[in-house]
Amino acid sequence: MLSIIAGFAALIWSADKFVEGAAATARQLGMSPLLIGLTVVALGTSAPEILVSIMAAMDGHAGLAAGNAIGSNIANIGLVLAITALIAPLPVKNSLILREIPLLVAITLLAGWCLLDLHLGLVDGILLLSGLAITLYLLFRWQKPPLAAENQQLADNEADEIPDIPLARALAILLVGLTVLLVSARALVWGATEIALLFGVSDLVIGLTVVAIGTSLPELAASVASALKGHHDIALGNIVGSNIFNLLAVLAMPGLIAPTHFETEILLRDYASMLALTLLLAAMAWLALRRGGIGRYSGGILFACYSAYYVALYFTL
């Protein structure tokens, strides 16, 4: 348990430093602030989940890696987004309805297709990573004109968030963050697998619960803090982006490193719950265009569904 707590704490701290160092390095190398925000920062914020999945797969615990990806998406919608909506209504932009959310639904269906045979292999991993490359391209293209004025404002906002520090210092922060990320991910995986052995549950269940919630804590803290400050309009976009990267980058790792077979529960219970929550979010976002946002009532429904999933998980252990 101590290893898990220390691993989570170090993971959250090092992920922040890794993103800071990577963004500052990219800025010094001439990348535009907008491109940094769409690639370096977006992928960097998923670094904890990616590193944990890599370490778990390398240790032969592919179930923990897959559970982390699916469980994090369930927690992002049913816990993080729900609590944020309970604090303040979440505005929904037209672009999110027309582009990012349909993309998330399509990627969720792609992940389901990869899991349909209860096997996650090399071909599945390559397919998911190819989807990641296409997604990054689409995200970049979608920020092009005719939304030039909006893009400039977004670029200015990104520039304000990226530290302007010397290249040598940026590289040092990047290396320190990456090193601590690797060590803390290793400690977290070790602690999680030990708990699985202690309680006699599968590493998939630990990935779906302890690890998934733990790696979602930064998103929860950031979303709640933004909502309390009145900046809750970015929360929905962040969750959608995080879920996309979880499925394409995190879920790909066990397929690439340690191809494995799963029990039917991962498809009928866990994936089905993730898909249902994703479709429910899409429906709520579409209805929110007329109602002015995803409000407390919707947040309550999402949290109730999240709680019901954990009840089902408990009774199917």
Give the label of every model feature segment:
Residues 1-317:
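Hydrophobic alpha-helical segments, chiefly the membrane-spanning helices
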